[in-house]
UniProtKB/Swiss-Prot annotation:
Source species: Macrovipera lebetinus
Disulphide bridges, residue numbers: C27-C38, C55-C144, C121-C136
Cited function: Interferes with one step of hemostasis (modulation of platelet aggregation, or coagulation cascade, for example).
GO CC aspect terms: extracellular region
Transmembrane residue ranges: none
Record-linked Pfam families: Lectin_C
Locations listed in the record: Secreted
Alphabetically ordered keywords of this record: Disulfide bond, Hemostasis impairing toxin, Secreted, Signal, Toxin
First and last residue of the signal peptide: 1-24
Source species taxonomy: Eukaryota, Metazoa, Chordata, Craniata, Vertebrata
Miscellaneous comment: Shows greater sequence similarity to the beta than alpha subunits compared to other heterodimer snaclecs.
Oligomeric and partner information: Heterodimer; disulfide-linked.
Protein name (database record): Snaclec B3/B5
């Protein structure tokens, strides 16, 4: 009986230590999980288009990160701060020219907004809240997001 309790306690410790790391969501090694999605910060700067292509190659359904709540934003900013110092990072929001409207690179409609100003491709800061835009051709670090 004592051995059963010991093993059960050990399994509980392992489960609790893995929760929040992405392991419970079947995220690939090096990716972190939150709300049915997996996230990874990449520290090799790319243009917005190259970063989006890179994310698509990483996992099935992968794209530059899209934000749908302030809680998700807080999770990603914390993840970034653990990996990079003060940086700006691309996210999947850009001007969809054929519709003259903003849209996420994964096709989701823009419902949650946190604009600081408006332009072409959108980035966020690892130290400040709010979104900003700049020319898509400029290089930036980025976060990829995929379904868990």
């Amino acid at each position: 009986m004592g051995r059963f309790i010991f093993v059960s306690f050990g399994l509980l410790v392992v489960f609790l230590s893995l929760s929040g790391t992405g392991a419970a969501l079947n995220c690939a090694s090096g990716w972190s999980g939150y709300d049915q999605h997996c996230y990874k910060v990449f520290d090799k700067p790319k243009s917005w288009a190259d970063a989006e292509k890179f994310c698509k190659k990483q996992t099935s359904g992968g794209h530059l990160v899209s934000f749908h709540s302030s809680e998700e934003t807080d999770f990603v900013v914390k993840l970034v701060s653990q990996t990079l110092e003060s940086q700006i990072l691309w996210m999947g929001l850009s001007k969809v020219w054929n519709q003259c409207d903003w849209g996420w690179s994964n096709g989701a409609k823009l419902k949650y907004k946190a604009w600081a100003e408006e332009s072409y491709c959108v980035y966020f800061s690892s130290t400040k809240k709010g979104w900003r835009s700049r020319a898509c051709r400029l290089l930036g670090h980025f976060v990829c997001k995929s379904p868990a």
